[in-house]
Amino acid sequence: GLWQVREWEWREHGVDLTLARLSPLSAGQGSADPGRPNRPPDLTLAPTQLVACEVPWDGNPGTPVPMILALASSANGGWPGASLYVDQGDGALLPLGPSGRTRAVIGTASTVLQSASPLLYDRQSSVTIALAGEDLTLDDATMRQLAMGANRAVLGSEIVQFASAEPLGEGEWRLSGFLRGRGGTETAVTGHQAGEALALLGSAGTILNAEAVGAVPSSRIVAIGLGDSLPVSATIALRGIGMRPPSPVHPRWQVDLDGSYRLTWVRRARGGWLWQDGVDLP
């Protein structure tokens, strides 16, 4: 067997040793696979991409009005987030806080979304979107889910909902099956162009302090991350939509007995976007 020398001492007759016997090795013991470390992926610091917009009031008394969102993202998951600022037109950057590490689902339109009626389900139109990162995804939605507000996105100056998201590879998706002009954006169903920004509402957007942003129409939201050589800025899309009442509907005219014309319409209230059963829209 094997022994280990614990102590030793010189004596007249020689050297005294204190030994400890080692446990014998098992007969079948041999070398083993040391395994592989679970190292995190070594991702580069990709630059920040940013979309900023104001969204319509959702009818919840606890929701700030106006509600301005900064949706920041990047090409990969190694992005550590960014610091957000507002430039009110004088070049000074006023801090708004961090964006957080979770990437928002944003992208740009590679094709043009054609105009369509906001009163009907748009089965004909489609648009191709290049997302900020190839690992970002979009989901399909049923008609019931659309009626409850699923897949709302800002595309240019229009809020749309889409039922179908078809992956095309390399971060591109084809969106189709639209509800158009949502949230009082009916006037923006025309005038779309390639290169305009898309931002999926309900993803990792940061709610900004509206008082800190200010009311200057030319204000821009600025993001600065570790991978950015220069600040990234974006104008605030849909500015004022949270405070502006939607356009009226159901215009009618009639001739009274005295020959005069009577014009009538139905006003819409902010916040009444869901199609609730048994309740007329306000």
Q: What do the predicted segments below correspond to?
A:
Residues 1-282:
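C-terminal extracytoplasmic interaction modules
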